[in-house]
């Protein structure tokens, strides 16, 4: 879970997005926050939407 959070934070920062910007139209800000901190695993649907917004392959998070 922590590795997923680290990778998500890396790709988000690489795109120059804040947590709130990434969460927009995808999920709650708190979901992004908890995932990046290794406290929560999001549903696959949300992970897919995050990857689409970041323009990265789904496998990049694992």
Feature locations, PLM:
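A short, Lys/Arg-rich alpha-helix, primarily the initiator
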Residues: 1-14
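Alpha-helical residues within helix-turn-helix
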Residues: 10, 20-21, 49
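Short alpha-helical DNA-recognition segment
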Residues: 16-34
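Short amphipathic recognition helices of helix-turn-helix/homeodomain-type DNA-binding modules
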Residues: 25, 60-62
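Short, conserved catalytic or interaction motifs in soluble domains
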Residues: 37
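DNA major-groove recognition helix of helix-turn-helix/homeodomain DNA-binding modules
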Residues: 45-60
